[in-house]
Every structure is written in C-alpha cells, then in structure tokens.
Amino acid sequence: MISPIKNIKNVFPINTANTEYIVRNIYPRVEHGYFNESPNIYDKKYISGITRSMAQLKIEEFINEKSRRLNYMKTMYSPCPEDFQPISRDEASIPEGSWLTVISGKRPMGQFSVDSLYHPDLHALCELPEISCKIFPKENSDFLYIIVVFRNDSPQGELRANRFIELYDIKREIMQVLRDESPELKSIKSEIIIAREMGELFSYASEEIDSYIKQMNDRFSQIKARMSVT
C-alpha cells in the first residue's frame, strides 16, 4: 500500500542552501539513507556534491530556475471556481499541463512525475497558496516520483487525490494477480478496469474517456487475436 505524504498547507519560501532540508520540507518521510547516497544523473542537474546531504544547490539550475518558475506560476494562478468544467486530455498530456490546469483553477486535482526531488517545478508548486502535493516513489523505478497536485480550496481536491492513490494501488494489485500474463496484457487489462473512474477524477470530458476505453479494448482484442494464431 502506498503511503504518500502531503506537504504542509503553507510551505514557506526556503532561504537555505541545505539540500537535505529543502527535500524534507516537502517530503518529510523520505528515508534518511536517501541523503547518504550520491546524487543520481537527474539530481545532478540541480545539485552538486559527493552525497545528497553534502551537496550544494546549483545557483542557475535550481535557485534561479525555481524563482523563475514560481513567478510564472503566480501569473497563472487563479482562485478555485465554484464549479469545474471538463477539460481535454491534451491539456494535461505533459507535466506542465497537468499542474497548470490545477493552479489555474480548471480542475481540482492532477498528477505528473518528476525525475528528481530537487526538480524546481515541484518546489515552486509547494509555495503557492492553497496548493498541496502528495508524493510517492513510482514502482519499478530508481528515480521517478509521482506527484499528485491538488487544490486545498476545493472540497474535491484532496478527496480526488486520495481516490487516485487508491486506484493506483488497485491497478498494482490487479497486475500482481495477472503476473503470469505478458506485461502488455497486464497493463491493458488493469487500465481498462480503472480507466473510467480515473478519467473522471482528472476531469476529462466524458467523450474522451469513452474514446480512450474503446482504444484500450481494441488493443486488447488485437493482442488476443494475435495470440490465438501463434
């Protein structure tokens, strides 16, 4: 079972070069051993040092970039509306689109991934008013982290974030049950089961959810047909 961590409601601007503190500030339960490890190739874009605990933040790549991104996010930020309208999947198909649709008030919750806990966008997001993130490591990956970003000023925000995490766990459990199937079949079968509710959580238009499920079912049929002739 995933145990994600939500950042505190108001993360204050960080005026420190301590590379351990800035991560614990947004992800308190990160394992202590994480900081005894050498920065990986993705961390090295933002910090430099023998270990993460002894590393220094890079001025241009982290400090200045986080400041630029935070300023941009503030210009795009909008208070939460009373009602949300469906969005297109295309609006959230890349990480920036995923969090931008949340902070601009288009939807209460989104999800994206980062390749480093020192990613400037993640730290900038955590300083915005009424924005929170739940963070957990992606399974079968040594460096990716799932970020669930949501609105605190919407009752739907954290409810949807928690349900997303439940569905994420359900998909993992389904894939474990189907462990004797091919990786492709496991992925498609588990996706079909959760796709509709997941799409609704992400505020996708119903016709796009229908189209995506049809696409998954068509792929499933093609694979089964291919297997039947081999």
Swiss-Prot record:
Pfam families: NleE. Coiled coil: none annotated. InterPro entries: NleE/OspZ. Keywords: Host cytoplasm, Host nucleus, Methyltransferase, S-adenosyl-L-methionine, Secreted, Toxin, Transferase, Virulence. Residues 49-52 are annotated as: Interaction with host proteins TAB2, TAB3 and ZRANB3. It comes from the Bacteria. It is found in: Secreted; Host cytoplasm; Host nucleus. Its EC number is 2.1.1.-. Belongs to the NleE/OspZ family. Cysteine methyltransferase effector that inhibits host cell NF-kappa-B activation by preventing nuclear translocation of host protein RELA/p65. Acts by mediating cysteine methylation of host proteins TAB2 and TAB3: methylation of a conserved cysteine residue of the RanBP2-type zinc finger (NZF) of TAB2 and TAB3 disrupts zinc-binding, thereby inactivating the ubiquitin chain-binding activity of TAB2 and TAB3, leading to NF-kappa-B inactivation. Also mediates cysteine methylation of host protein ZRANB3, inactivating its ability to bind ubiquitin chains. This is Cysteine S-methyltransferase OspZ.
